[in-house]
Amino acid sequence: MTRRVQLLCAWGAPVSMIAFAIGWVGFAGFLPPLSPSDNAAVIANIFAERRTGIRFGAIIMMVGTMFWIPWAAVVAAQPRRTERDRGVLPQTQVGCAVAATAIVIIAMLIWVVAAFRPDRPPELIQTLSDLGFVISIMPFAVFCVWNVALGLAIFADDGPAPAFPRWSAYLCMWTALLYVPGGALAFFQTGPLAWNGAFAFFLPAIAFFIWLIVMTVLTLRSINRPPGEDHEFSTIPASRQVPA
């Protein structure tokens, strides 16, 4: 992978963040998320009033989410320089990014369907709205595994010039822990553990975007490292190197 391609992939996270800011906040008006305690008539009215914005916002977020995959791939490729198994942890990270992208795209499509026909029964629109928010916010396990896999890869990168500083592995682990409250939204319609609450939505979302920013900066730094500091083959013992 050339340096230019790596740099393009590394900028995928900022692109996705901008897309979410424009789509989720600007067009759909889903910040804060719609209250799970609102009745069907209220939800149906919101989707009717914002039907164009919700559809545009969903399209923008679908496009932006796709940039998670190249970003995850280039981030996963950095500690791989010294990973002994040459594949398990990087593949896990990319697999989680693909799963996370698919989850978000499915949620966006559900909201498009909910906004597509405002003359549907309010209860049906509410069901689609609920389904979209549950799918987009609740699947914390995918993001936890993604972060933990990257953290383990950073810990395993014990060469003389590791791609990422060791503290970033702890950041990955703590961030993964902060995603867990999102799973509680299945049991609450009000309060901090509802899908519009501080613990189920805002804390995981803020943690995720901080993680994206920090890992993007560290990845750009790793990519721009002088060639002399690249130790892709330096960890292979001389006795195991194949003579030319």
Question: Could you tell me what each predicted segment is?
Answer:
Residues 1-244:
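Hydrophobic, aromatic-enriched alpha-helical segments typical of multi-pass transmembrane helices
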